[in-house]
């Protein structure tokens, strides 16, 4: 995949089936098996920010005189292919399918359970 530069428009944003507020499960990497809520999606980078997942410590220098430096722990984005939407009712992760409802609106549902997401 080519480098993505949002300002120059060299690549389009990637269509993502995961949205802010969804509960997801990590399927690969150091946090495999953990679940969390999506705080933010980054469609130009195909990444998601998940609460409590992929936490890293960052050393912050003092910005003003008289202030001390500190160590912050915060979440960093992970690739969208490393997460799957998680059903809290059935306790299972599943792929998402988009279908057109009887009234003509697009809906998302889990392939394994058939549970509607929205």
Curated annotation (Swiss-Prot):
One of two assembly initiator proteins, it binds directly to the 5'-end of the 23S rRNA, where it nucleates assembly of the 50S subunit. One of the proteins that surrounds the polypeptide exit tunnel on the outside of the subunit. Signal peptide: none annotated. PANTHER family: MITOCHONDRIAL RIBOSOMAL PROTEIN L24. It comes from Prochlorococcus marinus (strain NATL1A). GO terms for cellular component: ribonucleoprotein complex; ribosome. Belongs to the universal ribosomal protein uL24 family. This is Large ribosomal subunit protein uL24. Part of the 50S ribosomal subunit. Transmembrane segments: none annotated. One of its GO terms (biological process) is translation. Keywords: Ribonucleoprotein, Ribosomal protein, RNA-binding, rRNA-binding. It comes from the Bacteria.
């Amino acid at each position: 995949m080519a480098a993505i530069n949002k300002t120059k428009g060299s690549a389009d944003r990637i269509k993502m089936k995961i949205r802010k507020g969804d509960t997801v499960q990590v399927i690969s990497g150091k946090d495999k098996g953990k679940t969390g809520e999506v705080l933010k999606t980054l469609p130009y980078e195909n990444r998601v920010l998940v609460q409590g997942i992929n936490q890293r410590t960052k050393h912050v220098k003092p910005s003003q005189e008289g202030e001390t430096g500190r160590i912050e722990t915060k979440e960093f984005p992970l690739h969208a292919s490393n997460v799957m939407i998680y059903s809290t009712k059935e306790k299972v992760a599943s792929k998402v399918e988009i279908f057109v409802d009887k009234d003509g609106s697009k809906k998302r549902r889990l392939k394994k359970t058939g549970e509607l997401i929205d």
